[in-house]
């Protein structure tokens, strides 16, 4: 190989990477497009002639030649949480009051003008969340958000997004860097794509967000490259330590660090002192003409130390909130009202509407919530209703234009009997929801089957809404346990089911027997028990029997579980029908449990904060983390004055020195395990 060719390829890679950062990050192009294209083509031809010159971070390696067959599921090392929403300044102030209580600070007299907390305000980009992982400075993986715990590995498509660096712009990268951001489609690019689709006779995309999310899941990365997605980074994590120098201490420093590493960061972000400045920022950008879709402002506590102190709820970080712009509202006529019965028996009045475009989608149905809301609005069939999207997701009726009510409009109230099974409906004292009490109600059974088969529960492919209805109505399925007695011959009698599809569904059902207890627990549909809560409960009560025997007081003491959840769990297990269902499932080998069950774990570390540094003798970092958390402790990424213990292994990082400076107790692995006197030698199970 001619050294001059190697040098030329290296020069071209460096210049093209530098040009990409200048264009996408700093909005200050250093090369004309035509010059960039010519240099890119030269590098491409060099690599084609001499394949040994190709490197993983070469700009030519962004787009693959062959479409992927599927996207594997990957688990996020650091979960991607949702954000709590506020829809007006008053709700924002309530959020700050809760935050101040968590931080142990006195309320601010006038939080709009004299707020003492410092925040970073970032525009909420209407796109798709993305998790990026860099190992030793090179892009290792890009994944969708998924459910926050696990997403899809879409690395080939991520490499096709020009604004995402393949190599970090630093000579001293962290060993592992996790970057979070939003993939979006510029409005001009969205219009161009839709114009092409119309010309080709294809239906246009409803909105830029749908187009961006759909593009990320294209199996052919060449399609992704052609659609010119954009990216804004907004968070970074360094789970295995920071290189030389001090790591960022604030969210604002994180944003600046992201820019230095080569990521595009929204230039409109701003540090705000108190809620007064936050609301000014919100008012400034509400309704502004931007080159991309934005549906609000994300408000984050600036101090990373205070973020860690505030922590998380089961769903959201306590230190951040999305202040949403007012929802778009449109008028349309109510054609009819139907009562919809959900899997818990809740009866919801739903307005059937003349279809109307709203927030990028065509809306034909909207919720009326409950009987109280019906009376409050005085809803008539034939009325002109004001419809909006609640949190930009679920359409709801928020008002009636009574001045436009026609003479033949018909008043509506909820029926006294279930529309599905004709059982008299009940409204428990103190509740706004009207329910069908019949456990055999077909609508409830259909909903329960769908929930059991959902991706986060037993994940039974092929068991959707239509198939669940057929199983209930034609085959007499009454509980989820009945699913495991179905045969291919029975299914072949259903409309749309042939020999092969029947066999596949039965196989999918039988495979689900191997799902762990936490998924089964979520699939049972216990009120207030979502995916994360089910994981926490299953970690503390590793068998159904242990959870069924637990008192509400015991459950409520678990970190992350409140009294409301505890009472709902105890009430569910108290029902004889539910106990019978569990017995049936266990007779079928569901859930799949380890041969030797672990006893319930004590909460001896409740409230204690730990940091782990270095390599432990026998436990991996994840095993040690699970061991601590299963006993009520919390593992954090950085050392602070709130840290109770630092667990030290071989080759510790700078965290050891920080702990020594702060006088924080140090533990070996053996000393850590000795904190729980119930652990016998060799028992390292969480």
UniProtKB/Swiss-Prot annotation:
NAD(+) binds at residues 33-37, 82-83, 122, 145, 182, 300, 324. Transmembrane segments: none annotated. Residues 600-686 form the BRCT domain. The active site is at residue 124. It holds the Pfam family DNA_ligase_aden. Keywords: DNA damage, DNA repair, DNA replication, Ligase, Magnesium, Manganese, Metal-binding, NAD, Zinc. CDD domains: BRCT_DNA_ligase_like, LIGANc. Its cofactor is Mg(2+); Mn(2+). GO terms for biological process: DNA repair; DNA replication. Zn(2+) binds at residues 418, 421, 436, 441. Its EC number is 6.5.1.2. GO terms for molecular function: DNA binding; DNA ligase (NAD+) activity; metal ion binding. One of its GO terms (cellular component) is cytosol. It comes from the Bacteria. It catalyses: NAD(+) + (deoxyribonucleotide)n-3'-hydroxyl + 5'-phospho-(deoxyribonucleotide)m = (deoxyribonucleotide)n+m + AMP + beta-nicotinamide D-nucleotide. DNA ligase that catalyzes the formation of phosphodiester linkages between 5'-phosphoryl and 3'-hydroxyl groups in double-stranded DNA using NAD as a coenzyme and as the energy source for the reaction. It is essential for DNA replication and repair of damaged DNA. PANTHER family: CHROMOSOME TRANSMISSION FIDELITY FACTOR 18 (PTHR23389), DNA LIGASE (PTHR23389:SF9). Belongs to the NAD-dependent DNA ligase family. LigA subfamily. This is DNA ligase. It comes from Synechococcus sp. (strain JA-2-3B'a(2-13)).
